[in-house]
């Protein structure tokens, strides 16, 4: 087991180094691989990880000693940075990395970018973490969500900061960004 843990630690450290040195598209793909690895490790070991005590000002780079808070912070940080090179990701077809990931056969690979793939993964993650769909000082929830089903311009102009849940704010902002992009591209099929 000690050998296995050493190997895991080496892989994570090498991956983090590769992420720092990689070009934008490779960096985003490697960040997503990193996220998958640490999420999987956390899921398999969360019973023991959750027993660990959080330490103030801990900047431990050894993921084998991370607490639940450390894992969540790393996952969130990497999801937050995942789409930071939007233009390059949008201009790179998923075809270039289709061998790395399981891409559904229903996906039109010629019209699906690395950005589309990673934005979908980020959106799935955000949806799984949302705890409240309400606005701050919510009065009439039904009328408040109607904005999401109106025309695209109304949706884009919606102030997501009114929402209670930070992850819902991130999700709506991600969707608004996509909506804006496809409106500007006049690609109404993707709206």
List the model feature ranges, each with a label:
Residues 1-191:
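Extracytoplasmic/secretory-pathway proteins
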């Amino acid at each position: 087991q000690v050998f296995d843990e050493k190997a895991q630690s080496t892989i994570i450290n090498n991956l983090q180094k590769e992420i720092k040195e990689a070009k934008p598209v490779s960096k985003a793909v490697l960040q997503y691989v990193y996220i998958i690895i640490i999420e999987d490790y956390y899921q398999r070991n969360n019973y023991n990880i959750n027993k660990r005590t959080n330490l103030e000002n801990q900047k431990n780079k050894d993921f084998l000693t991370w607490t639940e808070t450390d894992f969540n912070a790393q996952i969130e940080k990497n999801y937050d940075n995942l789409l930071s090179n939007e233009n390059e990701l949008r201009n790179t077809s998923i075809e270039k990395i289709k061998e790395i990931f399981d891409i559904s056969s229903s996906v039109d690979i010629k019209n699906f970018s690395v950005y589309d793939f990673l934005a979908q993964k980020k959106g799935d993650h955000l949806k799984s973490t949302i705890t409240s769909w309400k606005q701050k000082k919510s009065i009439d929830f039904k009328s408040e969500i109607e904005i999401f089903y109106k025309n695209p311009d109304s949706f884009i102009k919606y102030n997501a900061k009114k929402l209670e849940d930070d992850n819902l704010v991130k999700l709506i902002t991600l969707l608004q960004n996509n909506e804006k992009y496809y409106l500007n591209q006049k690609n109404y099929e993707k709206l």
